[in-house]
A protein has these predicted regions:
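A catalytic-pocket lid/entrance helix-loop region that shapes and gates access to the active site
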Residues: 147-175
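Conserved serine/cysteine hydrolase catalytic core
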Residues: 204-268, 273-276
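Active-site loop/oxyanion-hole signature of alpha/beta-hydrolase fold enzymes
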Residues: 38, 80-121, 294
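Conserved hydrolase catalytic core segment
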Residues: 115-155
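Alpha/beta-hydrolase fold catalytic core
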Residues: 1-52, 75-76, 114-116, 297-300
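Catalytic histidine-centered segment of alpha/beta-hydrolase-like enzymes
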Residues: 277-289, 293
Length: 300
């Protein structure tokens, strides 16, 4: 197994491009930006030099770099956000990283960082957060894309994801954290998983590794209404209230969204569109980034 090199978050984009056959014409214009909110600092990656056209929100236990290949393929101004408690964004004292609270925090951040974005894209937890954001701040969400998630998500559908996230808090080496990640992602290349760990984990002082993200703690809201994520019933109601174009992108092999979820989504919002990406699991942006980029280009 390879060991971890010195980490530079802006030095790995050529690997993304090479793996997916994206022409490489030199390092893209990407920088870290921040917004101060009432819940702490929100950090994001700003792609391009113009005002963002798209806002990208990652899933739970991920970070803004999950969108790197999509961003390279799109080559448009993008803001890829680290959700609260993830990536370089601040951790909450109450460890409550649920859609409603995330949306309140991101409303503050996006009014500063991406007030005129044409599309908000959210995957998994980021998708539920973007749905809550569209409900509370519709002026910030002109088009909404949910990537492999609906409010119909439950523990059974997300069991494989939960099993991975509920793993050890610390790993004795980079090789150990890589081995576990490979075990749970057998369809992904080792190079992509290694790159993802470098973006999403940190080495602690004694040589061990841990994930960078903060997880919700017991008592922070989980299970209060018997659901894997609090407030899902209200998010179904939000689907009805969404007044902007709504697109659901399903991973063709993912169990997280089923046909009943699609039927409920389109019942509550008859104008919603659904696209299935063949061969993609839950992480559509990781499994089929070029296909997802083409879908998003069609919205611009």
């Amino acid at each position: 197994m390879p060991t971890a090199p010195v980490y530079d978050e802006f030095a790995l984009f050529h690997e993304n491009a090479e793996e997916f056959g994206i022409p490489w014409i030199g390092s893209p214009a990407v920088r870290r930006v921040e917004a101060e909110t009432s819940a702490g600092t929100i950090s994001a990656l700003a792609w391009g030099r113009e005002a963002p056209e798209l806002v990208l929100l990652h899933g739970g236990a991920q970070n803004a770099h999950t969108w790197d290949t999509v961003a390279l393929a799109l080559d448009r101004p993008i803001l890829a956000v680290d959700l609260p408690g993830h990536g370089h964004s601040a951790h909450r004292d109450d460890h409550a990283y649920w859609p409603a609270g995330n949306a309140a925090t991101l409303e503050e951040a996006l009014r500063e960082l991406a007030p005129e974005a044409r599309v908000v894209v959210g995957m998994s937890l980021g998708g539920l957060t973007s749905l809550a954001l569209a409900d509370r701040a519709p002026d910030l969400v002109r088009q909404l894309v949910l990537v492999d998630v609906t409010p119909g998500v439950n523990r059974e559908k997300a069991s494989a994801i939960a099993q991975f996230i509920d793993g050890p808090e610390f790993f004795e080496s980079f090789d150990e954290i890589l081995a576990r990640t490979i075990e749970f992602n057998p369809t992904r290349t080792v190079s992509s998983l290694r790159r993802g760990i470098l973006h999403n984990a940190i080495e602690v002082g004694d040589g061990r590794w841990r994930w960078r993200y903060d997880l919700p703690r017991r008592g922070s809201g989980e299970g209060e209404d018997g659901q894997i994520i609090p407030g899902l019933d209200e998010l179904w109601n939000a689907v009805e209230r969404v007044g902007v174009p709504l697109l659901l992108v399903r991973g063709g092999t993912s169990p997280v969204v089923d046909n009943e979820d699609v039927a409920e989504l389109t019942r509550r919002n008859p104008k919603a569109r659904v696209v299935v990406v063949a061969g993609a699991g839950h992480s559509v942006q990781g499994d089929k980034p070029l296909e997802l980029a083409e879908i998003l280009k069609g919205l611009l």
